[in-house]
């Protein structure tokens, strides 16, 4: 029988606020029935006799939230990354994405591919929660949901909706996309463990008005959130406006169907080029933006993350696999820092060698990966009292350092130089789902 009350001992690192990273050297983090009871130098009297997992000198961090990832694209990660301009992204879809995603009509193929995706996410990443795009195939989407649930992960998974502008036969009729989505919601509304459905129109150009209207109504009827893509590229924005003459901004194309936070929670990936109206919609509707620094940089674009955070827009991080070459949110953090500095240098510095930097640092990026995305799931993303207990143990020993260093320096090296072996253990909602030294916990 699993323990419901226990403690982890180690170097505890978290960011309850955007500005500051807190360090607790070899202290105790107590889990009490799936939530954090707090961090203590010594165990309080009521917890004196609980089990302690001793991770002395190892790092204990909150589980991270991948707010935008395409599970069926994992099989061709690292391919098609040399495209030279935005117009070639259509080639990327035609050559890589749509042909691969169309294969998931075969449940055996989906089972094999999703087994690898889930195994790698559990065992090699800091991710404990994710918002995941599947494909248009209902049965394959349920295969993915079950595998994630069986592994103990927490996630929202979306069956894609695409009833126009696709390729290779990878498209539903409008009637199919509506009926299959309703059937999928009926079959998954109670979830697979901690894995639940989320309405997922791929983006406006691939969804007719009829399907968008139906999806918006189903989101309310089944009380499930919505996720999609928004304002990723300038050509995409112009395409949307040419299709919908009655909108002022791209965001209106979702908002007119209740899918931009007016009726249910909404998550939008990228948002690199929001105009003033779209910006206010995001802010006032509490829409969460999934910042995907790798894929945006691949298109020569950088999201205005600092502006968003300072103005009160919610922001988390996404890998956007296969837009990023792997599932590592630690890499997403470092890239978010790099591109933030580049944006500041090119748009705000004004050739002033003494200009004050206004760009992301490690604490900020860590917050986005934990608390930033975690708020979409509830009280998730730090170790303050009553937050859900998601924790990942990181082991520095595998980096084979030749000298002793302060633990803060070791942590930086983990962030920038980690390997799959860096992940020692993982806990989700109080349940340990992975231990590197044990073959199976589920």
Regions found by a protein language model. Give the residues of each.
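Active-site gating loops and adjacent loop-to-helix segments of metal-dependent hydrolytic enzymes
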Residues: 75-110, 164-174, 233-263, 336-359
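His/Asp/Glu-enriched, well-ordered alpha-helical/loop segment
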Residues: 11, 252, 256-262, 305-400
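Divalent metal-coordination and catalytic microenvironments
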Residues: 11, 29, 34, 57, ...
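Alpha-helical scaffold segments that flank or form the walls of functional sites
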Residues: 30, 78-153, 177-191
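Metal-coordinating catalytic core of metallo-dependent amide/deamination hydrolases
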Residues: 139-272
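C-terminal cap of metal-dependent C-N hydrolases
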Residues: 17, 388-442
